[in-house]
Design a protein with these regions (language model features):
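Conserved C-terminal helix/tail region of periplasmic/extracytoplasmic solute-binding proteins
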Residues: 305-340
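Mature extracytoplasmic/periplasmic domains
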Residues: 246-314
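Hinge/lid segment of periplasmic solute-binding proteins
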Residues: 37, 56, 60-107, 122-125, ...
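Early extracytoplasmic/lumenal segment of secretory-pathway proteins
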Residues: 1-61
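Short beta-strand->loop
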Residues: 2-5, 69-80, 97-107, 114-117, 121-123, 224-242, 251-252, ...
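Ligand-binding pocket segment of bilobal, Venus flytrap-like solute-binding proteins
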Residues: 140-155, 162-231
Length: 340
């Protein structure tokens, strides 16, 4: 399995190895959807049986390029009935021809994070991305430098739709906003632990790009003033937040393993769903929490760490993460702004 961290942990792979003695089970974790997809394009379609990436790629690239294959609806559709309401008929799990091409599991709203002792949740949700353009916030925030996400979030801050082409005057607007966001930041780092530490010790009051995934370890350690925020409104159909949802799909390996779909079924089990949610030092909700058998495995502190109290509401205010339309041009502008 080629995956985001979590599926490669001993808590997940150990029990599967025990259940399948004699099988060789190998997992490699990546930190970029495009990089993982490029491995398949470069010939590693012969190596992997499953791929776990965020929601737009299966339908937009992997399936049209024959890098993944349909899953058995008879075998896997019943699992959707046990998921949270927002996943019961999740459109990005299906190709345009109606085939089932991936199963959702981990997910989370991903916009920005504040210290609620300094900026109230209500104010942060109300201000949305404008918070970072406020002159009083100069040098009081950090930027978590996940470049693809920064590009999306700068578009939203500039009042633009990242999933439509950004050209002409809109591109100028993106450039100005990128320069302001990067120029007025106190800290630029891709280390979420360092960012949470700076937030807790008062070095910054908020950070641009972040969410449940990055706030949860600090919250689980007791710093519940670290909170992921989803704006109440925004420039795309009234929405300003973005949500990522991982889909796990079967690679179109010419010499497939019959254990691939067994593993996909295995991670739906309550105790394995819980292990996927809480592993490797970041904690995330999973779609399987629609089942009482899964939900009952989480205690109050764990649910608080992943902000379960507001998740459904935040999801409703978020756009699905999609492929950024003008990515090549925008990443170039963004990189210059970041370096200067």
């Amino acid at each position: 399995i080629l995956c985001w961290e979590g599926y490669n942990s001993d808590e997940v792979l150990g029990p599967f190895r025990s259940a399948n003695p004699g099988a060789t089970v190998r997992a490699e974790s990546g930190t970029s959807d495009p990089d993982m997809i490029n491995k398949l394009r470069a010939g590693e379609i012969n190596v992997w049986d499953l791929i776990n990436v965020n929601q737009p790629w299966a339908r937009d690239q992997l399936y049209p390029e024959n890098l993944i294959k349909p899953l058995s609806k008879d075998r896997f559709m019943p699992y959707f009935d046990k998921m949270l309401p927002e996943f019961k008929d999740y459109p990005l799990s299906f190709a345009s021809d109606g085939n089932l091409i991936g199963l959702p599991q981990r997910y989370g709203p991903f916009s920005f994070v504040v210290n609620t002792d300094k900026i109230s949740r209500d104010m942060a949700e109300d201000q949305g991305w404008n918070l970072f353009l406020d002159s009083s916030m100069k040098k009081k925030y950090g930027v978590l430098t996940y470049d693809n996400w920064n590009v999306m979030h700068i578009c939203l801050t500039a009042g633009l739709n990242p999933f439509k082409p950004v050209e002409g005057g809109d591109r100028d607007k993106f450039k100005t906003t990128a320069e302001q966001i990067m120029g007025n930041a106190n800290i630029l780092t891709d280390d979420l632990v360092a960012m949470n530490t700076a937030l807790i010790n008062g070095e910054i009051d908020a950070y641009f790009t972040g969410g449940t995934y990055t706030a949860s370890p600090a919250r689980y350690d007791g710093a519940t003033n670290v909170r992921g925020i989803t704006p109440r409104s925004g420039p795309v159909d009234g929405k300003g937040g973005v949500v990522w949802i991982e889909l796990t799909s079967a690679v179109n390996n010419p010499d497939p393993s019959n254990l691939a779909e067994d593993f996909l079924e295995f991670v739906q089990k309550p105790e394995i769903s819980k292990a996927v949610a809480f592993t490797e030092g970041t904690y995330n909700p999973v779609s399987q929490m629609g089942s009482d058998n899964v939900m009952s495995l989480f205690d109050k502190d764990e649910l608080d760490a992943i902000q379960m109290d507001s998740l459904a509401e935040e999801m409703s205010r978020s756009l699905d993460y999609q492929v950024v339309a003008s990515y090549d041009a925008l990443i170039e502008i963004y990189t210059k702004a970041r370096r200067s």
